[in-house]
């Protein structure tokens, strides 16, 4: 157990050492306490794994690769169907995560894009 401020300062002989002791005490007080680790119950872990497996398998069914780590995916978000054209990246556990680069189209935007595909193809050929 550390000595109190009074005991340390009375036992030291110089004023320089007093200021050093005060600095050390302040540093100890400023040290950030470690965050407690939340423990998961065994039942919660298995439920979380089961739901993540279900969502990843349904996600894989609706993903279409169009390039290296680039996919078009169809998903439901808050009751609306979205078509994502997005880059993905691998996390440290080897799981694919969606990246920032990409776009989500609602059904109206997707329909407009499909209608204009032939015009877009023509523009590409001209270049």
UniProtKB/Swiss-Prot annotation:
GO molecular function: DNA helicase activity; DNA-binding transcription factor binding; identical protein binding; RNA polymerase II cis-regulatory region sequence-specific DNA binding; single-stranded DNA binding; transcription coactivator activity
GO biological process, one term: positive regulation of transcription initiation by RNA polymerase II
Ranges for region Disordered: 1-63
Domain of life: Eukaryota
Intrachain disulfide bonds: none
Site (Cleavage): 50-51
InterPro entries linked to this entry: PC4_C, ssDNA-bd_transcriptional_reg, Sub1/Tcp4-like
Keywords: Acetylation, Activator, DNA-binding, Isopeptide bond, Nucleus, Phosphoprotein, Transcription, Transcription regulation, Ubl conjugation
Cross-link (Glycyl lysine isopeptide (Lys-Gly) (interchain with G-Cter in SUMO1)) at residue(s): 68
Per UniProt, location of the Glycyl lysine isopeptide (Lys-Gly) (interchain with G-Cter in SUMO2) cross-link in this chain: 68
Residue numbers bearing the Phosphoserine modification: 4, 9-11, 13, 15, 17, 19, 55-58, 118
Family: Belongs to the transcriptional coactivator PC4 family.
Quaternary structure and partners: Homodimer. Interacts with CSTF2.
Function according to Swiss-Prot or TrEMBL: General coactivator that functions cooperatively with TAFs and mediates functional interactions between upstream activators and the general transcriptional machinery. May be involved in stabilizing the multiprotein transcription complex. Binds single-stranded DNA. Also binds, in vitro, non-specifically to double-stranded DNA (ds DNA).
Protein name: Activated RNA polymerase II transcriptional coactivator p15
Record organism: Mus musculus (Mouse)
Gene label: Sub1
